[in-house]
Protein backbone atom coordinates (compact mmCIF):
# COMPACT_ATOMS: atom_id res chain seq x y z
CA UNK A 1 0.00 0.00 0.00
CA UNK A 2 1.32 3.44 -0.94
CA UNK A 3 1.54 6.25 1.65
CA UNK A 4 3.36 9.04 -0.21
CA UNK A 5 1.43 12.21 -1.07
CA UNK A 6 3.43 12.81 -4.25
CA UNK A 7 2.35 11.00 -7.44
CA UNK A 8 3.26 7.33 -7.45
CA UNK A 9 5.39 6.40 -10.43
CA UNK A 10 3.79 3.66 -12.53
CA UNK A 11 5.31 2.12 -15.66
CA UNK A 12 3.30 0.31 -18.32
CA UNK A 13 5.64 -1.96 -20.27
CA UNK A 14 5.32 -3.71 -23.62
CA UNK A 15 2.33 -1.75 -24.95
CA UNK A 16 3.11 -2.72 -28.55
CA UNK A 17 -0.29 -1.73 -29.93
CA UNK A 18 -0.54 1.58 -28.05
CA UNK A 19 -3.86 0.76 -26.38
CA UNK A 20 -2.99 1.14 -22.69
CA UNK A 21 -3.26 4.91 -22.12
CA UNK A 22 -7.07 5.28 -21.93
CA UNK A 23 -7.31 2.50 -19.35
CA UNK A 24 -4.79 4.13 -17.00
CA UNK A 25 -6.24 7.67 -17.19
CA UNK A 26 -8.45 7.01 -14.18
CA UNK A 27 -5.35 6.55 -12.02
CA UNK A 28 -4.27 10.17 -12.50
CA UNK A 29 -3.30 12.38 -10.66
CA UNK A 30 -2.58 9.89 -7.86
CA UNK A 31 -0.28 8.02 -10.23
CA UNK A 32 2.25 9.39 -12.69
CA UNK A 33 1.95 7.11 -15.73
CA UNK A 34 4.82 6.32 -18.11
CA UNK A 35 4.13 4.01 -21.05
CA UNK A 36 6.81 2.09 -22.93
CA UNK A 37 5.83 0.63 -26.29
CA UNK A 38 9.10 -1.19 -26.87
CA UNK A 39 10.70 -4.11 -25.04
CA UNK A 40 14.37 -4.34 -24.17
CA UNK A 41 16.11 -7.70 -24.40
CA UNK A 42 15.57 -10.01 -21.40
CA UNK A 43 17.81 -9.36 -18.41
CA UNK A 44 18.39 -13.07 -17.83
CA UNK A 45 19.22 -14.09 -21.41
CA UNK A 46 22.90 -14.94 -22.01
CA UNK A 47 22.75 -13.12 -25.36
CA UNK A 48 21.72 -9.81 -23.79
CA UNK A 49 24.67 -7.35 -23.65
CA UNK A 50 25.58 -5.87 -20.27
CA UNK A 51 24.85 -2.41 -21.65
CA UNK A 52 21.25 -3.42 -22.37
CA UNK A 53 20.88 -4.92 -18.90
CA UNK A 54 22.06 -1.63 -17.41
CA UNK A 55 19.65 0.29 -19.65
CA UNK A 56 16.78 -1.91 -18.46
CA UNK A 57 17.65 -1.33 -14.81
CA UNK A 58 17.87 2.44 -15.31
CA UNK A 59 14.55 2.43 -17.14
CA UNK A 60 12.72 0.55 -14.40
CA UNK A 61 14.46 1.81 -11.24
CA UNK A 62 12.25 4.89 -10.63
CA UNK A 63 8.94 3.02 -10.56
CA UNK A 64 6.89 1.84 -7.60
CA UNK A 65 4.37 -0.02 -9.74
CA UNK A 66 5.12 -1.84 -13.00
CA UNK A 67 2.53 -3.33 -15.34
CA UNK A 68 3.65 -5.97 -17.83
CA UNK A 69 2.14 -8.10 -20.59
CA UNK A 70 2.64 -11.81 -19.98
CA UNK A 71 6.32 -12.80 -20.28
CA UNK A 72 7.42 -10.02 -22.64
CA UNK A 73 9.67 -8.58 -19.92
CA UNK A 74 11.02 -11.26 -17.55
CA UNK A 75 11.72 -10.32 -13.94
CA UNK A 76 14.38 -12.67 -12.54
CA UNK A 77 15.64 -12.19 -9.00
CA UNK A 78 18.83 -10.52 -10.21
CA UNK A 79 16.76 -7.75 -11.81
CA UNK A 80 14.30 -7.39 -8.93
CA UNK A 81 17.19 -6.84 -6.52
CA UNK A 82 18.19 -3.75 -8.52
CA UNK A 83 14.73 -2.13 -8.31
CA UNK A 84 14.55 -0.72 -4.75
CA UNK A 85 11.40 1.32 -5.37
CA UNK A 86 9.28 -1.51 -6.77
CA UNK A 87 6.32 -2.51 -4.58
CA UNK A 88 3.77 -3.95 -7.04
CA UNK A 89 4.51 -5.95 -10.18
CA UNK A 90 1.34 -6.58 -12.17
CA UNK A 91 1.25 -9.17 -14.94
CA UNK A 92 -1.50 -10.38 -17.26
CA UNK A 93 -2.83 -13.91 -17.19
CA UNK A 94 -3.00 -15.90 -13.98
CA UNK A 95 0.58 -17.15 -13.88
CA UNK A 96 3.93 -15.89 -15.11
CA UNK A 97 6.87 -18.26 -15.26
CA UNK A 98 9.19 -15.35 -16.12
CA UNK A 99 8.69 -13.83 -12.65
CA UNK A 100 10.90 -14.95 -9.76
CA UNK A 101 8.17 -15.17 -7.15
CA UNK A 102 10.53 -16.45 -4.44
CA UNK A 103 12.81 -13.44 -4.81
CA UNK A 104 9.85 -11.06 -5.00
CA UNK A 105 8.36 -12.37 -1.78
CA UNK A 106 11.72 -12.05 -0.04
CA UNK A 107 12.06 -8.47 -1.28
CA UNK A 108 8.51 -7.54 -0.29
CA UNK A 109 7.34 -7.03 -3.88
CA UNK A 110 3.72 -7.98 -4.45
CA UNK A 111 3.05 -9.84 -7.71
CA UNK A 112 -0.42 -10.19 -9.20
CA UNK A 113 -2.07 -11.18 -12.47
CA UNK A 114 -5.22 -10.58 -14.49
CA UNK A 115 -7.71 -13.23 -15.54
CA UNK A 116 -8.15 -13.81 -19.26
CA UNK A 117 -11.93 -13.53 -19.07
CA UNK A 118 -14.08 -11.76 -16.52
CA UNK A 119 -15.68 -14.26 -14.13
CA UNK A 120 -18.93 -12.29 -14.42
CA UNK A 121 -18.98 -12.54 -18.23
CA UNK A 122 -22.07 -14.64 -18.94
CA UNK A 123 -20.89 -15.34 -22.47
CA UNK A 124 -17.61 -16.87 -21.29
CA UNK A 125 -19.00 -20.40 -21.11
CA UNK A 126 -20.34 -20.15 -24.65
CA UNK A 127 -17.07 -19.10 -26.22
CA UNK A 128 -15.27 -21.24 -28.73
CA UNK A 129 -11.57 -22.10 -28.70
CA UNK A 130 -9.16 -19.73 -26.98
CA UNK A 131 -6.97 -17.32 -28.89
CA UNK A 132 -3.83 -19.50 -28.86
CA UNK A 133 -5.77 -22.44 -30.28
CA UNK A 134 -7.14 -20.23 -33.04
CA UNK A 135 -3.68 -18.87 -33.80
CA UNK A 136 -2.17 -22.35 -33.97
CA UNK A 137 -4.84 -23.47 -36.44
CA UNK A 138 -4.22 -20.31 -38.48
CA UNK A 139 -0.48 -21.05 -38.63
CA UNK A 140 -1.09 -24.65 -39.68
CA UNK A 141 -3.42 -23.57 -42.46
CA UNK A 142 -1.14 -20.69 -43.40
CA UNK A 143 1.95 -22.84 -43.90
CA UNK A 144 0.08 -25.77 -45.47
CA UNK A 145 -1.77 -23.51 -47.94
CA UNK A 146 1.23 -21.22 -48.63
CA UNK A 147 -0.84 -18.15 -47.73
CA UNK A 148 1.98 -15.70 -46.96
CA UNK A 149 3.99 -16.85 -49.99
CA UNK A 150 1.02 -16.59 -52.34
CA UNK A 151 -0.06 -13.22 -50.96
CA UNK A 152 3.40 -11.80 -51.67
CA UNK A 153 3.53 -13.44 -55.10
CA UNK A 154 0.19 -12.00 -56.21
CA UNK A 155 1.04 -8.51 -54.92
CA UNK A 156 4.29 -8.65 -56.90
CA UNK A 157 2.60 -9.62 -60.15
CA UNK A 158 2.87 -13.40 -59.87
CA UNK A 159 0.25 -16.11 -59.85
CA UNK A 160 0.22 -19.81 -58.94
CA UNK A 161 3.69 -21.00 -57.94
CA UNK A 162 3.34 -23.72 -55.28
CA UNK A 163 1.11 -26.68 -54.48
CA UNK A 164 -0.81 -26.59 -51.21
CA UNK A 165 -0.79 -29.45 -48.71
CA UNK A 166 -4.22 -30.83 -47.84
CA UNK A 167 -4.92 -31.86 -44.27
CA UNK A 168 -7.70 -34.41 -44.72
CA UNK A 169 -6.53 -37.92 -43.90
CA UNK A 170 -3.10 -36.73 -42.77
CA UNK A 171 -1.65 -37.35 -39.30
CA UNK A 172 -1.36 -34.63 -36.67
CA UNK A 173 1.14 -35.27 -33.89
CA UNK A 174 0.79 -33.26 -30.70
CA UNK A 175 3.57 -33.08 -28.14
CA UNK A 176 1.37 -32.54 -25.11
CA UNK A 177 -2.35 -33.21 -24.74
CA UNK A 178 -3.27 -30.55 -22.22
CA UNK A 179 -5.88 -27.88 -22.86
CA UNK A 180 -4.19 -26.35 -25.91
CA UNK A 181 -2.97 -29.60 -27.42
CA UNK A 182 -6.41 -31.10 -26.97
CA UNK A 183 -8.21 -28.10 -28.47
CA UNK A 184 -6.03 -28.04 -31.59
CA UNK A 185 -6.21 -31.82 -32.02
CA UNK A 186 -9.99 -31.85 -31.65
CA UNK A 187 -10.47 -29.21 -34.34
CA UNK A 188 -8.10 -30.90 -36.77
CA UNK A 189 -9.80 -34.25 -36.20
CA UNK A 190 -13.44 -33.15 -36.32
CA UNK A 191 -13.19 -30.41 -38.94
CA UNK A 192 -10.35 -31.55 -41.19
CA UNK A 193 -10.49 -35.31 -40.74
CA UNK A 194 -6.93 -35.67 -39.50
CA UNK A 195 -5.73 -38.67 -37.52
CA UNK A 196 -4.35 -37.74 -34.11
CA UNK A 197 -1.30 -39.16 -32.38
CA UNK A 198 -0.01 -37.80 -29.09
CA UNK A 199 2.94 -38.01 -26.74
CA UNK A 200 4.06 -36.48 -23.49
CA UNK A 201 6.39 -37.80 -20.84
CA UNK A 202 3.48 -38.85 -18.61
CA UNK A 203 0.61 -39.42 -21.06
CA UNK A 204 -1.06 -42.84 -21.01
CA UNK A 205 -3.57 -44.26 -23.47
CA UNK A 206 -6.13 -44.45 -20.68
CA UNK A 207 -5.71 -40.75 -19.95
CA UNK A 208 -5.98 -39.88 -23.66
CA UNK A 209 -9.19 -41.92 -23.93
CA UNK A 210 -10.64 -40.04 -20.96
CA UNK A 211 -9.74 -36.73 -22.57
CA UNK A 212 -11.53 -37.79 -25.76
CA UNK A 213 -14.67 -38.74 -23.84
CA UNK A 214 -14.59 -35.57 -21.73
CA UNK A 215 -14.34 -33.54 -24.94
CA UNK A 216 -17.37 -35.19 -26.50
CA UNK A 217 -15.38 -37.43 -28.84
CA UNK A 218 -15.57 -41.21 -29.24
CA UNK A 219 -12.65 -43.24 -27.95
CA UNK A 220 -12.43 -44.96 -31.35
CA UNK A 221 -12.69 -43.23 -34.72
CA UNK A 222 -14.61 -44.49 -37.77
CA UNK A 223 -11.72 -46.77 -38.72
CA UNK A 224 -11.63 -48.40 -35.31
CA UNK A 225 -8.44 -46.62 -34.29
CA UNK A 226 -8.02 -44.60 -31.12
CA UNK A 227 -9.23 -41.04 -31.62
CA UNK A 228 -6.20 -39.89 -29.63
CA UNK A 229 -3.56 -42.57 -30.12
CA UNK A 230 -0.66 -42.40 -27.68
CA UNK A 231 2.67 -43.23 -29.30
CA UNK A 232 6.34 -42.94 -28.48
CA UNK A 233 8.11 -39.66 -29.12
CA UNK A 234 10.12 -41.34 -31.89
CA UNK A 235 7.00 -42.65 -33.62
CA UNK A 236 5.32 -39.27 -33.43
CA UNK A 237 8.21 -37.46 -35.12
CA UNK A 238 8.68 -40.14 -37.77
CA UNK A 239 5.03 -40.59 -38.79
CA UNK A 240 3.25 -37.25 -38.26
CA UNK A 241 2.60 -34.94 -41.20
CA UNK A 242 2.32 -32.05 -38.75
CA UNK A 243 4.24 -31.99 -35.47
CA UNK A 244 2.93 -29.37 -33.04
CA UNK A 245 4.40 -28.47 -29.67
CA UNK A 246 2.02 -27.88 -26.73
CA UNK A 247 4.16 -28.06 -23.60
CA UNK A 248 4.80 -25.86 -20.58
CA UNK A 249 8.35 -24.54 -20.42
CA UNK A 250 10.28 -25.75 -17.38
CA UNK A 251 13.83 -26.76 -16.54
CA UNK A 252 12.86 -30.30 -17.46
CA UNK A 253 11.22 -29.49 -20.81
CA UNK A 254 13.73 -26.88 -21.99
CA UNK A 255 15.38 -28.13 -25.19
CA UNK A 256 13.08 -31.16 -25.36
CA UNK A 257 13.11 -31.03 -29.18
CA UNK A 258 16.49 -31.25 -30.88
CA UNK A 259 18.25 -32.54 -33.96
CA UNK A 260 17.71 -36.20 -33.07
CA UNK A 261 13.93 -35.65 -33.07
CA UNK A 262 13.84 -33.36 -36.10
CA UNK A 263 15.94 -35.83 -38.11
CA UNK A 264 13.09 -38.34 -37.83
CA UNK A 265 10.56 -36.09 -39.57
CA UNK A 266 9.35 -36.84 -43.07
CA UNK A 267 10.57 -34.48 -45.84
CA UNK A 268 6.93 -33.50 -46.43
CA UNK A 269 6.20 -32.69 -42.77
CA UNK A 270 5.65 -29.38 -40.98
CA UNK A 271 6.81 -28.30 -37.52
CA UNK A 272 4.63 -25.91 -35.48
CA UNK A 273 5.45 -24.11 -32.22
CA UNK A 274 3.01 -21.79 -30.45
CA UNK A 275 4.16 -22.72 -26.93
CA UNK A 276 7.60 -21.38 -26.00
CA UNK A 277 10.75 -20.98 -28.08
CA UNK A 278 13.23 -22.55 -25.64
CA UNK A 279 11.36 -25.87 -25.77
CA UNK A 280 13.25 -26.37 -29.03
CA UNK A 281 16.99 -26.21 -29.57
CA UNK A 282 16.75 -23.31 -31.98
CA UNK A 283 20.06 -23.91 -33.74
CA UNK A 284 19.01 -27.49 -34.55
CA UNK A 285 15.71 -26.30 -36.03
CA UNK A 286 17.44 -23.60 -38.06
CA UNK A 287 19.90 -26.13 -39.47
CA UNK A 288 17.11 -28.50 -40.50
CA UNK A 289 15.18 -25.72 -42.22
CA UNK A 290 18.22 -24.22 -43.94
CA UNK A 291 18.98 -27.65 -45.39
CA UNK A 292 15.37 -28.07 -46.52
CA UNK A 293 15.02 -31.39 -44.72
CA UNK A 294 11.33 -30.84 -43.93
CA UNK A 295 8.59 -29.05 -45.86
CA UNK A 296 8.36 -26.15 -43.48
CA UNK A 297 7.76 -24.64 -40.06
CA UNK A 298 5.33 -22.14 -38.58
CA UNK A 299 6.49 -20.40 -35.42
CA UNK A 300 4.96 -17.89 -33.03
CA UNK A 301 7.65 -18.11 -30.35
CA UNK A 302 11.43 -17.82 -30.27
CA UNK A 303 14.43 -18.16 -27.94
CA UNK A 304 14.98 -14.42 -27.82
CA UNK A 305 12.01 -12.06 -28.05
CA UNK A 306 11.58 -9.61 -29.65
CA UNK A 307 13.65 -11.13 -32.44
CA UNK A 308 16.85 -9.12 -33.02
CA UNK A 309 16.92 -7.31 -36.36
CA UNK A 310 19.77 -9.51 -37.54
CA UNK A 311 18.11 -12.78 -36.49
CA UNK A 312 18.44 -15.55 -39.04
CA UNK A 313 14.68 -16.00 -38.84
CA UNK A 314 14.35 -12.49 -40.28
CA UNK A 315 17.26 -12.42 -42.72
CA UNK A 316 17.19 -15.79 -44.51
CA UNK A 317 15.24 -16.10 -47.75
CA UNK A 318 13.12 -19.01 -46.66
CA UNK A 319 11.48 -21.17 -49.30
CA UNK A 320 14.22 -20.47 -51.87
CA UNK A 321 17.38 -22.30 -52.95
CA UNK A 322 16.32 -25.54 -51.32
CA UNK A 323 15.43 -24.03 -47.95
CA UNK A 324 12.23 -25.01 -46.16
CA UNK A 325 9.23 -22.70 -46.10
CA UNK A 326 8.91 -20.72 -42.88
CA UNK A 327 5.91 -18.77 -41.57
CA UNK A 328 6.54 -16.45 -38.61
CA UNK A 329 4.37 -14.40 -36.28
CA UNK A 330 5.56 -12.20 -33.37
CA UNK A 331 4.21 -14.15 -30.36
CA UNK A 332 0.61 -13.27 -31.17
CA UNK A 333 -1.07 -16.39 -29.79
CA UNK A 334 -2.70 -14.53 -26.89
CA UNK A 335 -3.02 -11.08 -28.47
CA UNK A 336 -6.72 -10.47 -29.08
CA UNK A 337 -8.41 -7.09 -28.85
CA UNK A 338 -11.03 -8.06 -26.28
CA UNK A 339 -8.56 -9.96 -24.10
CA UNK A 340 -5.97 -7.18 -24.10
CA UNK A 341 -8.48 -4.48 -23.13
CA UNK A 342 -9.88 -6.69 -20.38
CA UNK A 343 -6.38 -7.31 -19.02
CA UNK A 344 -5.68 -3.59 -18.81
CA UNK A 345 -9.02 -2.98 -17.07
CA UNK A 346 -8.24 -5.61 -14.47
CA UNK A 347 -4.68 -4.31 -14.09
CA UNK A 348 -6.04 -0.86 -13.23
CA UNK A 349 -8.48 -2.42 -10.77
CA UNK A 350 -5.62 -4.24 -9.07
CA UNK A 351 -3.53 -1.08 -8.84
CA UNK A 352 -6.45 0.70 -7.18
CA UNK A 353 -6.98 -2.19 -4.77
CA UNK A 354 -3.30 -2.13 -3.84
CA UNK A 355 -3.38 1.65 -3.31
CA UNK A 356 -6.46 1.34 -1.10
CA UNK A 357 -4.90 -1.42 0.99
CA UNK A 358 -7.25 -4.12 -0.29
CA UNK A 359 -6.30 -7.63 -1.32
CA UNK A 360 -5.25 -7.75 -4.97
CA UNK A 361 -6.79 -10.16 -7.45
CA UNK A 362 -4.86 -13.21 -8.68
CA UNK A 363 -1.79 -13.04 -6.47
CA UNK A 364 1.09 -14.89 -8.14
CA UNK A 365 2.47 -16.27 -4.86
Where are these regions (language model features)?
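Rossmann-like dinucleotide/phosphate-binding beta-alpha-beta segment
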Residues: 23, 161-267
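Short, well-ordered coil/turn residues at beta-beta hairpins
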Residues: 68-69, 92, 239, 245-249, ...
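Rossmann-like dinucleotide-binding domain for NAD(H)/NADP(H)
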Residues: 268-365
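Rossmann-fold NAD(P) dinucleotide-binding segment
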Residues: 73-86, 252-271
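Oxidoreductase and adenylate-handling cofactor-binding alpha/beta cores
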Residues: 130-152, 182, 186-194, 346-356
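Residue-level detector of alpha-helix initiation sites
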Residues: 127-131, 158, 179, 334
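N-terminal glycine-/charge-rich "phosphate-binding" loop or analogous flexible N-terminal tail
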Residues: 1-65, 69-70, 205, 213
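Phosphate/diphosphate ligand-binding glycine-rich loop within oxidoreductases
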Residues: 61-155, 165
Amino acid sequence: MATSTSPIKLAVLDDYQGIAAPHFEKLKPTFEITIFRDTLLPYNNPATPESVKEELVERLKPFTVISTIRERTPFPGALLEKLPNLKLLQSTGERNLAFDTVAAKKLGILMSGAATLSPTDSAAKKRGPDSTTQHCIALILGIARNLAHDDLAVKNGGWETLLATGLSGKTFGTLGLGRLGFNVAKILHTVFGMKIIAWSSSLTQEAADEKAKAGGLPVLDDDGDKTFKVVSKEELFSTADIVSLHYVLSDRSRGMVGKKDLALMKPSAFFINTSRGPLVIERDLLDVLKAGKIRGAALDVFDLEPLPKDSEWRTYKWGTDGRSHVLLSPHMGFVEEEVMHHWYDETVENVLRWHEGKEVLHSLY
